[in-house]
């Protein structure tokens, strides 16, 4: 009986370890991918930059994208 309980606990620990490892290996978001709902998922050389959207002076939303660290984007007319 003790052997069955011990075996069950070992199997549970192994399955938990495999699931935790799979969770840590999620693919990162590439450059220009939307990161509005996942700001920490950009690849290591990128940062999640967010921009407000406005219409007639009123804020209507927010967009976030994975962009290169240290790069400044300027609007061109």
From Swiss-Prot:
Prodomain positions: 21-26
Family annotation (Pfam families): Toxin_35
Secreted found in the keyword field: yes
Gene Ontology, cellular component aspect: extracellular region
Signal peptide: 1-20
Record InterPro entries: Spider_toxin_CSTX_knottin
Keyword Ion transport annotated: no
Keywords: Disulfide bond, Secreted, Signal, Toxin
PTM info: Contains 4 disulfide bonds.
One example GO MF annotation: toxin activity
Protein localization: Secreted
Tissue expression remark: Expressed by the venom gland.
Family assignment from sequence similarity: Belongs to the neurotoxin 19 (CSTX) family. 08 (U8-Lctx) subfamily.
Protein name: U8-lycotoxin-Ls1e
Highest classification ranks of the organism: Eukaryota, Metazoa, Ecdysozoa, Arthropoda, Chelicerata
């Amino acid at each position: 009986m003790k052997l069955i309980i011990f075996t069950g606990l070992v199997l549970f620990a192994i399955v938990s370890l495999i699931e935790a490892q799979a969770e840590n290996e999620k693919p990162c978001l590439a450059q220009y991918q939307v990161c509005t709902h996942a700001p920490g998922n950009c690849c290591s050389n990128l940062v999640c930059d967010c921009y407000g959207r406005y219409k007639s002076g009123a804020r209507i939303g927010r967009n976030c994208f994975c962009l290169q660290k240290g790069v400044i984007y300027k609007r061109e007319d």
